[in-house]
Every structure is written in C-alpha cells, then in structure tokens.
Amino acid sequence: MDPHSPGLTGGVQNQPDFQAGIADHLSHFASEVPCFVVQAMEEYTTLTGREYHPVQTVWTEDADWILLGMGSVTDDAEAVASNLRNQGKRVGVVSVKLLHPFPEADVIRALQGKKAVTVLERSGTTALTQLVNQALYRSFENHHTERHPGIPGLSELPSVSTAIFGLGGHDLQPRHLVAAFENMISARNVPLYYLGSKFFSDSTSPEMNALQEQLKKAYPETVSKALENGEN
C-alpha cells in the first residue's frame, strides 16, 4: 500500500462479493501460510539451533499408542512415555506446533498404522480432537477416492479418545498421563474423560453414599469421565 495514496478495500460488500472474498481468503492466503511458517521455523533454527516443525514426533516409528497434544503438556507426555517405554510399552508422542491451518497431512503420517491416539486437551471444547478427527476422516476418504489432495489415505483408523486437563489451573501429575495411557490400551478405552478429577468421594457417611449412588444412577456417564490413578 502506498501511504501517500491510501485506499480502502472491502469496506462495503454485497453478499456475492463477501462470499467470494471468504473463498479467496482460503485459497490465496490461508493455503500459503504453512509454507511461510516452515520458512520461519527454519530461520529460527538457523538463529538459535532449536529445531521446530509444524508437527514434531518422539518415538512414533515403532509406537502402537500415541499421546498427542499442543504446548508444554507434550514435554510431560514425553517424560511419561520414556518411563513407559522402559517398561516395554510402545508409546510415542506427537506435538502439534501449528494449529491453523491444521497440518493434516503431517498428523496423518504420524498416526499411520497406530492402534489408538489420546488427544490431550486443555479446553472443554475439544477443538484439537475435532481437527484430528477431521484429518482422519479425510484420510479415510482418500483411501477410496482422492478428494483431499496431499493427505495420505488410510484404510484403517486409530481409535481416538480425549483427555481434558488443566481447566482452571487444575494440576496435572505424571500419574494422570499414565492413567490416560492405561485407558487407551484397555478394552473399554473411554472416549472422553477429565485427568485428575474425582467426581465421587470415598465417604464413610451412609447418607452421602446413598446420595452418590443416586447421582451415579441418574448420570452414569459421569462415572466414566474420571480415571483411576496410581502413584507418580
């Protein structure tokens, strides 16, 4: 833009122009963002020596089970995964560094051939899980007919569960992530739960026990939203 000859675009738009503008934004702007993000990450690596990619993986090559998340929780997940792998558990960690546009192809390559993935969500809206599920659905479609260019086709999809944590600053302990892994490999594999929460107490009061039993009967899904936790 020439500051000596400023102009205004998009100030007044009728319906056809507005809709066309939205489509143009997706095709001519958003689709190019990943290239610039990768370029910026490469420049950052050159300057600092710290390497970043839109999707980073640890121990995923031979893993059957995946813990996937964003942000610092993946550092905790790596520490727990290291301990589990020392016990012979084939678990890996996928860390998403770019949320939008979501790097679907990279995520699919990381999840290809896995039995299950647990998405670590620090949000009750489960936005990250929805993006992972969308990528998996598109990869499944591409196995039959390529409708989504660039996304590898998968004939079998891993089961997906959501582990919500940290709401309101709720503490996250290693034992909570171990519980998430144990749930993932279990036959039940609860699809959604809250790490570290306990919705019913071990009360010695007959009145409290009776009330809790009524609540469990009225809201049975609440029982499954809390996992049994061991020691750290």
Residue ranges of model-derived segments:
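Terminal amphipathic helices with adjacent charged low-complexity linkers/tails
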Residues: 1-6, 10, 111-136
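Conformationally flexible catalytic loops at phosphate/diphosphate-handling active centers
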Residues: 1-57
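Catalytic phosphate/nucleotide-handling subdomain of diverse soluble enzymes
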Residues: 79-89, 106-108, 112, 120, ...
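Short acidic loop-to-helix transition motifs that present clustered carboxylates
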Residues: 96-104
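Peripheral docking tails and interdomain loops at the edges
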Residues: 121-231
